[in-house]
Swiss-Prot record:
Residues 76-284 form the ABC transmembrane type-1 domain. This is sn-glycerol-3-phosphate transport system permease protein UgpA. It is found in: Cell inner membrane. Belongs to the binding-protein-dependent transport system permease family. UgpAE subfamily. InterPro entries: MetI-like, MetI-like_sf, UgpAE/MalFG_permease. It comes from Escherichia coli O6:K15:H31 (strain 536 / UPEC). The gene is ugpA. Part of the ABC transporter complex UgpBAEC involved in sn-glycerol-3-phosphate (G3P) import. Probably responsible for the translocation of the substrate across the membrane. Residues 1-11, 102-109, 178-207, 284-295 are cytoplasmic. Residues 33-80, 131-156, 229-262 are periplasmic. GO terms for cellular component: plasma membrane. The keyword Cell inner membrane applies. The keyword Chaperone does not apply.
Length: 295
C-alpha cells in the first residue's frame, strides 16, 4: 500500500502554515505555564516588585496546609460527581430522544438551551430556585418536611454546585452522544431486534460499544471542564462556602492570588493543578483509551 505525502514548493511553507497555532500556543499556554512554574519557586512580595528564590518551600508549605488538602480532596470529589453525572444524564437524554421520545425536534431544541447560558448565570438561576426563603424548589421540599439551606449545609452546597455545573454541560454532551447514536447503522439495531434482543439489551450490547470513542472524548473534556470551567458556578453560587466545603483548587488559586495577594502560593497551586490534570489525562489515554475500539 503506497502513501503519498504533500509536496510544497517552498520548504518554509509548512512552517508558515503552523506558525499561527504555534504562536498562540506559546503565548497563551507555554509562556504562562513557565511563568507559573518560575513564581512557584520564588517568595514574591504582594505587589510582585521583588522576589527571592526559595526552591520547593512553597510546595512543602502547601502539602502541610490542612485547608489546601481539604480543597484538594474537594476537587477530586467535585470533579468525579460532575464528570460521571454529566455523562450519564446526557447519555440518558440522548438515548430517550433517539429511541423513545416522539417529536424529538422539540426536545433537541430544549436540550440545547443550557449551552446558551453563561456559567455564572446558570448558577444564579439555580440559586433563585433553591433560595432558602423564596425558592420554588425549596418550597416544594418544605412540603415534604425537608429543610434546605445551602448557605449553612455543606452537603446541600456541594449538591447545588454539582447540579448547576452538570446542567450547564448537559447540552454539550447531549450533542455528541445524540450524533453518535444517529451514526449507528440501523441494520445492526434491526438485526438485533429480529434476533429477540430487547431495547435495553440492544443499547448496552450494540449502541454503547459503538459510541465508546465519543464517550472517551467526552470523559476527557468533562474532566477538564470540572477542574477549570466550573469556577464561575462556584463563585456565583457559594463563593467556596460554607466553611470551604465547595472550595476547589481553581477557586483556592483565585483566592490566594487575587484576594490574598500571595502570588508564590497561588503559582505553586497552579503548578500542582496543572500536573494533576496532566497525570489524569495520561492515565485516561493509557488505560481507558486502550479499551476503546475505533471503527
Amino acid at each position: 500500500m503506497s502513501s503519498s505525502r504533500p509536496v510544497f514548493r517552498s520548504r518554509w511553507l509548512p512552517y508558515l502554515l503552523v506558525a499561527p497555532q504555534l504562536i498562540i500556543t506559546v503565548i497563551f499556554f507555554i509562556w504562562p505555564a513557565g511563568e507559573a512554574l518560575w513564581y512557584s519557586l520564588q517568595s514574591v512580595d504582594p505587589f510582585g516588585f521583588s522576589s527571592q528564590f526559595v526552591g520547593l518551600d512553597n510546595f512543602v508549605t502547601l502539602f502541610h496546609d490542612s485547608y489546601y488538602l481539604d480543597a484538594f480532596w474537594t476537587t477530586i470529589k467535585f470533579s468525579t460527581f460532575v464528570t460521571v453525572s454529566g455523562l450519564l444524564v446526557s447519555l440518558f437524554f440522548a438515548a430517550l430522544v433517539e429511541y423513545i421520545v416522539r417529536g424529538s425536534r422539540f426536545y433537541q431544541t430544549l436540550m440545547l438551551l443550557p449551552y446558551a447560558v453563561a456559567p455564572a448565570v446558570a448558577a444564579v438561576l439555580w440559586i433563585f430556585l433553591f433560595n432558602p426563603g423564596r425558592g420554588l424548589i425549596t418550597h416544594f421540599l418544605a412540603e415534604f418536611g425537608y429543610d434546605w439551606n445551602h448557605a449553612q449545609n455543606s452537603g446541600q452546597a456541594m449538591f447545588l454546585v454539582v447540579f448547576a455545573s452538570v446542567w450547564k454541560q448537559i447540552s454539550y454532551n447531549f450533542l455528541f452522544f445524540y450524533a453518535a447514536l444517529q451514526s449507528i447503522p440501523r441494520s445492526l439495531i434491526e438485526a438485533a431486534a429480529i434476533d429477540g434482543a430487547g431495547p435495553i439489551r440492544r443499547f448496552f450490547k450494540i449502541a454503547l460499544p459503538l459510541i465508546a470513542p465519543v464517550s472517551f472524548f467526552l470523559l476527557v473534556v468533562n474532566l477538564v471542564y470540572a477542574f477549570f470551567d466550573t469556577f464561575p458556578v462556584i463563585d456565583a453560587a457559594t463563593s467556596g462556602g460554607p466553611v470551604q466545603a465547595t472550595t476547589t483548587l481553581i477557586y483556592k488559586i483565585y483566592r490566594e492570588g487575587f484576594t490574598g495577594l500571595d502570588l508564590a502560593s497561588s503559582a505553586a497551586q497552579s503548578v500542582v493543578l496543572m500536573f494533576l490534570v496532566i497525570v489524569l489525562t495520561v492515565v485516561q489515554f493509557r488505560y481507558v483509551e486502550g479499551k476503546v475500539r475505533y471503527q
